[in-house]
Amino acid sequence: MADGEDIQPLVCDNGTGMVKAGFAGDDAPRAVFPSIVGRPRHTGVMVGMGQKDAYVGDEAQSKRGILTLKYPIEHGIVNNWDDMEKIWHHTFYNELRVAPEEHPVLLTEAPLNPKANREKMTQIMFETFNAPAMYVAIQAVLSLYASGRTTGIVLDSGDGVSHTVPIYEGYALPHAILRLDLAGRDLTDALMKILTERGYSFTTTAEREIVRDVKEKLAYIALDYEQELETSKTSSSIEKSYELPDGQVITIGAERFRCPEVLFQPSMIGMEAAGIHETTYNSIMKCDVDIRKDLYGNIVLSGGTTMFPGIADRMSKEITALAPSSMKIKVVAPPERKYSVWIGGSILASLSTFQQMWIAKAEYDESGPSIVHRKCF
């Protein structure tokens, strides 16, 4: 990495639902596409159509009617490395149009992930893509960088996993990190179920994508769930209609806030877990008593599942109810929070002080994949 001046590091935030990729120093990711690999359900009959045996990302999304869609990442953990390799290949060569052997690569992962997951990521980057250097950073820590803070508790909720990470003066407090395997995809599944009760059937992997779109466009979080339910029974003010791809129009009312309510009441989908407000509170309570005040005053939301309207107010209300009465509570919801992990990665990879943190290919060749645990937090 001697002539590191003209080489921009690549930042790749591999989410369960979306891949966000781009160049360090940019203020937004260049490529954002679904983490999907699709394989044809039918056999091709027309010669010369150039049919592929696998489609990745947006192309898989647009041809979803004839494909079986698979997500290689579930709950933040890669469960299909061949497909994951296809996604990275697509990211580097088709989306960013770069040669990975010429750029250091910064990858992200969820906290409390299995060690093997991180080692395999390292191995693929060095052995398959021949990266000159790489680094694996924790997603929530990057979100805090992006918000310009060094102290705070980050609630990062994406498509596959939510986690709370308290950070004090730049140090993550690993004993207080909590992870909740409840996130956007579970909400989409919950909405599929609720809509089935209404007589609309969504079953295939392609139809799940339609429901995800309904969720993203129409769902919101009620400040007072019970009261909102009462209102929805008597008035039709919250009903909205959505046009399906085939032109059929469906109306959704109470489903709009029933679906994301699962974040606060996981028992609604039969999960025995604390909601996001309680998880955040529990995480703060695991920290030293002297720093709790700073954490309560800097609760930072990040990730796509925190994009629901009303989430910051509700979060504030729920945590105020749990915390000591005199405590000042501030929930920060930056407008760019959907991409704040990526933005934080872009900031981190372009810091001059970060340059000695990279794992170089030579170090990898010497020690093997386990080096990632020594060099990355």
Swiss-Prot record:
Domain of life from the UniProt record: Eukaryota
Keyword set includes Nucleotide-binding: yes
Chief localization: cytoplasm
PROSITE patterns for the chain: ACTINS_1, ACTINS_2, ACTINS_ACT_LIKE
The entry's keywords: ATP-binding, Cytoplasm, Cytoskeleton, Hydrolase, Nucleotide-binding
Signal peptide residue numbers: none
Compartments where located: Cytoplasm, Cytoskeleton
GO cellular component: actin cytoskeleton; cytoplasm
Entries under Pfam families matching the protein: Actin
Reactions listed under catalytic activity: ATP + H2O = ADP + phosphate + H(+)
Gene Ontology terms for molecular function: ATP binding; hydrolase activity
EC number: 3.6.4.-
UniProt enzyme class: hydrolase
InterPro entries the UniProt entry points to: Actin, Actin/actin-like_CS, Actin_CS, ATPase_NBD
SMART domains named in the record: ACTIN (SM00268)
Similarity remark: Belongs to the actin family.
Task of the protein: Actins are highly conserved proteins that are involved in various types of cell motility and are ubiquitously expressed in all eukaryotic cells.
Name used for this protein in its record: Actin
